[in-house]
């Protein structure tokens, strides 16, 4: 199941599994892992320039002010942070926020990371665009916007 389904647009506020992306670019792919008796899908092997798309969020008149992502960075040196750009409607669309993911010590050692976002209204696709050095950057488990 992806976000490009027949059920209508998504609300930006509930937590969404990252593995529900409707499009992935580059080396990134969906993996699953058994956590607390339930298989969770997440995006793995993300590299510089890869992106994940989610269609469509209905922001309506919701006053979102932030964004939180559960992610992991298997690097051990703090100079190897990954950067995630939150863009609307395309990989080079309007930038609404930027999130840094420093090393967490393991590729599934999930931590929550947050950033402020610019106000958004209406219906939009969300593109998570990833940047960094040295091949594999991070894994992403889930995310949501904050009102």
Residue ranges and their predicted role:
Residues 1-147:
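Extracytoplasmic
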């Amino acid at each position: 199941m992806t976000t490009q389904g027949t059920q209508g647009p998504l609300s930006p506020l509930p937590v969404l599994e990252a593995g529900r992306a409707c499009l992935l670019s580059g080396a990134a792919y969906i993996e699953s892992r058994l956590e607390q008796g339930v298989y969770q899908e997440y995006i793995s092997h993300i590299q510089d320039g890869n992106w994940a798309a989610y269609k469509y969020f209905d922001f309506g008149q919701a006053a979102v002010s932030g964004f939180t992502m559960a992610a992991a960075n298997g690097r051990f040196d703090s100079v190897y942070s990954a950067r995630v750009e939150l863009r609307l409607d395309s990989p080079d669309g309007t930038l609404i926020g930027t999130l840094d993911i420093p090393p967490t010590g393991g590729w599934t050692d999930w931590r929550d990371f947050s950033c402020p976002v610019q106000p958004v209204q209406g219906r939009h696709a969300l593109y998570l665009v990833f940047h960094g050095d040295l091949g594999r950057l991070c894994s992403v488990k889930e995310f949501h916007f904050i009102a």
